[in-house]
């Protein structure tokens, strides 16, 4: 929003343009187009691409969260904190952006913020290049991976550990902390860089677009931007099919498939691609002027659309006024831009207290906090949940979210906006629609408690076998073996449907590779823990109920769609529930509360809940690292239970809002009746 001096300058320019328009001008001169950097339509195109790329780079981490955990040995609590850390930088600067928004060169600030986002993306990929190649077992660097290191060998023949305890404590742990520190720094920079992009871009469009075209431009912008998270999951699905060290593959290749639980995809490659897109999208912003000529004409498309109704001008004004809340939602309006910093600090507490005392505002924001907490946890950990619960690959889990869940959520947002506009819903009707959407979302989540796969038998972990790793039929079958406790090379006894953490723990002494046209299959032989010293296959046991992932994700997606319907009506409740002079602050407070109470803590809460269901942790240098196995039933109950808790909170808040609005309506009706009777008596 321009300040007073800017408005005065623009007003003078408008008067000058009206004077010039009275003079005859050459028709050829009129036909000459303005430069593309003086065209608001080109700015809309550039900003749509930039916000799309920004959401891709910020959402990509969520698509590869389980892969990053495996690569760097992180718990879900730590990875959740990492995913939420970009909110720290964002929150720390958003108030300054709101206050000084009209005092800076907005396009250049957007460009600088985008460059910082790209730098953050490069930093996120940096740990891959400065770390050692990924070793998916504990073989020594000079040995062939996945061979003798995991076999049952006598103590005298066992391969030595690759790292001593001294080197582990002094070198490996330092490198681990360095990698994690780099990623947390990158997430902070990602949040800081994203601060000016959306607010400055939308305010710039609204300032220099024709008042009737502005809602259309912003609608196009939001429609394109909403595809960003879906593309991020799609990109994650593609990248995680590639091996993490695709740029430095070992000479002998690898003996892993994407279905192997030790598989780590090329998580870093998506950050490089997204960062490159952000740099390309940021380049034009350094050539846009601080102020461009105001768009003077309405689009012919809009004229045709609105021709059948009221006059174009009135329709355009109506749409502009209805879209004004969307501008405020993005943090566009500056908080008291005509006040000095000292005056702003004096006024702020009084207005803040007045807004917080409003019951409708408080309840709607609390409901949005619950919904946002549910969304933040789902977006961060649902791919990992699907991987573990249904034994599917990370690539397929991301594909399901990107192609089904996110598109249906976008449809829900659009449907909610259309219902509010077409039906001209009152505040009470908006609250009823929100209540209905929350109720349907809650009901759709009930079957999720019963759709899932139980943890299959894992020798020594999910079976009550005392101290012995082998089945109870063969006690002590792997005692002669010198098995490393922290090794992980899962194998499956398909006859008994029992999984072992390594061939060594199954007592296997031999290894056979069967070559095929498309892939090779590895088997381990002479296994003392298997009936008849039989043969077992490499890899985890396949789940017998993986097919249930489709009805599960369908219910999740339908729930996301009906929950998204409440987005626009709940926002309208905030705008219509506070005083006109407090709307800007109310929207700003809503924005801050959602980030502080939902988007920051929710991934950490969900990650902590997931960690409590772990039954076997990997150990790195004596510390607890990534979880190898979960109790699937407990994981499902706690993850879905947490979602159910937040959905219930949202439902209760909307029910209270509807009850308050009905009470206010009855009181207003009673007052009107009393006033009417008093007038009749007079």
From Swiss-Prot:
Residues 471-531 form the Kazal-like domain. Residues 1-41, 102-107, 207-225, 290-354, 421-424, 576-584, 662-682 are cytoplasmic. Expressed in liver, kidney, heart, lung and retina. Widely distributed in all brain regions. InterPro entries: Kazal_dom, MFS_trans_sf, OATP. It is found in: Cell membrane; Basal cell membrane; Apical cell membrane. It is a multi-pass membrane protein. Disulfide bonds join 477-508, 483-504, 492-529. GO terms for cellular component: apical plasma membrane; basal plasma membrane; basolateral plasma membrane; plasma membrane. Residues 62-80, 133-176, 247-264, 377-396, 449-552, 611-643 are extracellular. The chain crosses the membrane at residues 42-61, 81-101, 108-132, 177-206, 226-246, 265-289, 355-376, 397-420, 425-448, 553-575, 585-610, 644-661. Residues 13-30 have a biased composition (Basic and acidic residues). Pfam families: OATP. Gene3D superfamilies: MFS general substrate transporter like domains. It catalyses: coproporphyrin III(out) = coproporphyrin III(in); substance P(out) = substance P(in); taurocholate(out) = taurocholate(in); prostaglandin E1(out) = prostaglandin E1(in). GO terms for biological process: bile acid and bile salt transport; liver development; monoatomic ion transport; organic anion transport; sodium-independent icosanoid transport; sodium-independent organic anion transport; transmembrane transport. The modification Phosphoserine is found at residues 21, 311, 314. Glycans are attached at residues 165, 255, 526, 533. Belongs to the organo anion transporter (TC 2.A.60) family. Most likely contributes to the absorption and the disposition of a wide range of drugs in the intestine and the liver. NCBIfam families: oat. Mediates the Na(+)-independent transport of organic anions such as taurocholate, the prostaglandins D2 (PGD2), E1 (PGE1) and E2 (PGE2), leukotriene C4, thromboxane B2 and L-thyroxine. Also plays a role in the reuptake of neuropeptides such as substance P/TAC1 and vasoactive intestinal peptide/VIP released from retinal neurons. May act as a heme transporter that promotes cellular iron availability. Also transports heme by-product coproporphyrin III (CPIII), and may be involved in their hepatic disposition. A conserved histidine residue in the third transmembrane domain (His-128) might play an essential role in the pH sensitivity of SLCO2B1/OATP2B1-mediated substrate transport. Transmembrane domain 1 (TM1) may be localized within the substrate binding pocket. PANTHER family: ORGANIC ANION TRANSPORTER (PTHR11388), SOLUTE CARRIER ORGANIC ANION TRANSPORTER FAMILY MEMBER 2B1 (PTHR11388:SF87). This is Solute carrier organic anion transporter family member 2B1.
């Amino acid at each position: 929003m321009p300040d007073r001096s800017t408005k005065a300058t623009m007003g003078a320019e408008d008067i000058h343009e009206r004077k010039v328009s009275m003079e005859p001008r050459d028709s050829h001169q009129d036909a000459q187009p303005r430069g593309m950097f003086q065209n608001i339509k080109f700015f809309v195109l550039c900003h749509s691409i930039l916000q799309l790329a920004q959401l891709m780079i910020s959402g990509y981490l969520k698509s590869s969260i389980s892969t990053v955990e495996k690569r760097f040995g992180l718990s879900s609590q730590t990875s959740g904190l990492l995913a939420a850390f970009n909110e720290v930088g964002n929150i720390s600067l958003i108030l300054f952006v709101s206050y000084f928004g009209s005092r800076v060169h907005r396009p250049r600030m957007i460009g600088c913020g985008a460059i910082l986002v790209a730098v953050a993306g490069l930093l996120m990929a940096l740990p891959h290049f400065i770390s050692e190649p990924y070793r998916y077992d504990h073989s020594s660097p000079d040995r062939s991976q996945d061979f003798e290191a995991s076999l049952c060998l006598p103590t005298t023949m066992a391969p030595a550990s690759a790292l001593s305890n001294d080197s582990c404590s002094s070198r490996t742990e330092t490198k681990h902390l360095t990698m994690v520190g780099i990623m947390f720094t990158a997430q902070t920079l990602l949040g800081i860089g994203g601060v000016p992009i959306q607010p400055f871009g939308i305010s710039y469009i609204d300032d220099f677009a024709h008042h009737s075209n502005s809602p259309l431009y912003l609608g196009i912008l939001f429609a394109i931007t909403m595809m960003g998270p879906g593309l991020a999951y799609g990109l994650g699905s593609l990248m995680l099919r590639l091996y993490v060290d695709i740029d430095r593959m070992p000479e002998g290749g690898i003996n892993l498939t994407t279905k192997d639980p030790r598989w780590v995809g090329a998580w870093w490659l998506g950050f490089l691609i997204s960062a490159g897109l952000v740099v390309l999208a940021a380049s034009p912003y350094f050539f846009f002027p601080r102020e461009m000529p105001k768009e003077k004409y309405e689009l012919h498309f809009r004229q045709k659309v609105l021709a059948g109704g009221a006059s174009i001008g009135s329709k355009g004004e109506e749409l502009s006024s209805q879209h004004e809340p969307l501008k405020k939602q993005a943090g566009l309006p500056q908080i008291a831009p005509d006040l000095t910093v000292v005056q702003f600090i004096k006024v702020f507490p009084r207005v803040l207290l007045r807004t917080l005392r409003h019951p409708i505002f408080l309840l709607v924001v609390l409901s949005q906090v619950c919904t946002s907490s549910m969304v933040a946890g789902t977006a961060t950990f649902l791919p990992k949940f699907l991987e573990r619960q249904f034994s599917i690959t990370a690539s397929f889990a991301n594909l399901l979210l990107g192609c089904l869940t996110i598109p249906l959520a976008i449809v829900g947002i659009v449907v909610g906006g259309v219902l509010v506009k077409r039906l001209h819903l009152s505040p009470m009707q908006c609250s009823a629609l929100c209540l209905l959407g929350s109720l349907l979302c809650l009901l759709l989540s009930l079957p999720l408690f019963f759709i899932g796969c139980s943890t299959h038998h894992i020798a020594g972990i999910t079976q009550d076998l005392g101290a012995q790793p082998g089945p109870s039929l063969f006690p002590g079958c792997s005692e002669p073996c010198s098995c490393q406790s922290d090794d992980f090379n899962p194998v499956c006894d398909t006859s008994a449907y029992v999984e072992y953490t390594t061939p060594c723990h199954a007592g296997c002494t031999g290894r056979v590779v069967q070559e095929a046209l498309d892939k090779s299959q590895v088997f381990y032989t002479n296994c003392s823990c298997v009936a008849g010293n039989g043969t077992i296959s490499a890899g985890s046991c396949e789940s017998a109920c993986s097919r249930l992932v489709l009805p599960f994700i369908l219910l999740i997606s339908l729930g996301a769609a009906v929950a998204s319907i409440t987005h626009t009506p709940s926002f309208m409740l905030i705008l219509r529930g506070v005083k006109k002079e407090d709307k800007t602050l109310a929207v700003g407070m809503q924005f801050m509360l959602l980030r502080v109470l939902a988007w920051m803590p929710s991934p950490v809460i969900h990650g902590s809940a997931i960690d409590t269901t772990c039954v076997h942790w990997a150990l790195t240098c004596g510390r607890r690292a990534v979880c190898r196995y979960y109790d699937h039933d407990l994981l499902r109950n706690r993850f879905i239970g947490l979602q159910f808790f937040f959905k219930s909170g949202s439902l209760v808040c909307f029910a209270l809002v509807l009850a308050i609005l009905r009470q206010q309506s009855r009181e207003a009706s009673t007052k009107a009746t009393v006033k009417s009777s008093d007038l009749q008596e007079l």
